[in-house]
Amino acid sequence: HQTLLKAQQYHELIGLDLKVIEDPQDAEFKEGRINIIDIPLENPDELKFGEVQAQCGNAAYQCIKKMVELSVEGKISSLATAPLNKEALHAAGHIYPGHTELLAELTNTEDYSMLLYSPNLKVIHVSTHISLRTFLDTLNKNRVERVINIANDFLRMAGYEKPNIAVAGVNPHAGENGLFGTEEIEILYPVIKKCQADGIKVDGPIAPDTVFLRAFNGEFDLVVAMYHDQ
């Protein structure tokens, strides 16, 4: 258990008991205990903490892959991941923009989006790990419609009988009728009208500087954001 031995060098500093298990059913849940399924490292002695390394990126990939396998097998019910260093991941040859795309490929999922969830605010993204310029160049009706439908399906699965969805605008003031950009007029309005005709309760596009507060205050169940840092 080379990976565990490396971790044990530090466990006394934080007062945790590390237990190696082969299967989730072998886990013992008690205070101070961390159950570990060991993922072997190729050269653990070469690890340099605080530095970006290819084998660290590969280790992260293998851990996520193992979690997905356990989830698909029904042995675990959810995943909790630490931040993924994209530079290390790419150095190991795993070319993914982030967790979202990696999880989609490992689960053979074609329609997907990143969703941020909290009791008071839920946000789903039309685009994720791409530049703002690329987002503007690739924004299209089909993608926006797919994300609205994903959002509606998710809320229904989460127990919302009549989901109420808001769509954020792309531009300041949601374009101000074309004064500050035409994406709202050319792309968002037509898609929203189509989704409404399909029976989805969706409103927008709404100015990005107010829509999140309105959702937080309970006016909407979820916001469809246009890009990663909106």
Regions found by a protein language model. Name each.
Residues 91-118, 196:
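Short, acidic/small-residue loops that bind anionic groups at enzyme active sites
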Residues 39-44, 113, 117-119:
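Flexible glycine-/small-residue-enriched beta->alpha junction loops
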Residues 3, 102, 114, 123-125:
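Conserved hydrophobic/aromatic beta-strand scaffold that supports enzyme active sites
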Residues 119, 125-130, 169-171:
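Short, structured patches in soluble enzyme cores that scaffold and shape functional sites
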Residues 32, 116-124, 165:
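Mobile beta-alpha loop/short-helix "lid" or hinge segments that flank ligand
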Residues 101-110, 130-156:
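Active-site glycine-rich loop that binds ribose-phosphate moieties when present
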